Amino acid sequence: MANLFWGKKKIAVVGVNGNSMAKRIVEEMKAQGMKGVVELDAPKAYPDYYTLAQLEPDYVLFVYESAQCKVKITRVEGLLGDRLGHNVRRDTEESRQAQSYYKHQLKMIGIDPILLGAEEIPLREVKDIPWFYTSKVPMLHLHLPKAEGAEKAVCKAVQDYFRE
């Protein structure tokens, strides 16, 4: 069922290390009417980061398969080098807000997520792509165990974010 809140939103699901969990999440999102879902491979170099930025997604989710469940925000910060003392830092407020929707959904299927910490994208890789440090879209790193219903919980958390 398509929805006004999330039906046309661009959502980038990045599968890290070619895991099957990312594919299952994408399939579930499409089944729930999220038409703008795109699956990407993990960025390894500048062209991959550039491709992600060109999509201009409304939500970015890096998915890892892991024994322990963690939902982390993405940090990009450092000296840009274009002028003396120009320090850039990605605004993480929207990411923190999006992160909060995972706790309830994952606990409902018996997974207790850790919501502390951040994963860093090296500034040297993305300093020429301003979208990474100027955009406020949620960019989360989701470490998920293989559990029954995990992809549905992730889909529901994303829907809840767009509903608010």
Task: Write out the residue ranges for each language-model feature.
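Active-site histidine-acidic residue metal-binding/catalytic motifs
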Residues: 1-51, 57, 77-80
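Loop/turn elements at helix/coil->beta-strand transitions in domains of secreted/extracellular proteins
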Residues: 9-10, 32-36, 55-60, 112, ...
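Residue-level marker of intrinsically disordered, low-complexity segments enriched
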Residues: 9-14, 35-36, 109, 113, ...
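Active-site microenvironments of hydrolase-like enzyme catalytic domains
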Residues: 16, 42-100, 121-143
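Stable alpha-helical elements in mature extracytoplasmic
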Residues: 21-25, 45-48, 94-98, 102, ...
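Sec/Tat-exported extracytoplasmic proteins
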Residues: 25-33, 56, 64-65, 92, ...
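Active-site-adjacent mobile loop/cap segments within catalytic or ligand-binding domains
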Residues: 113-164
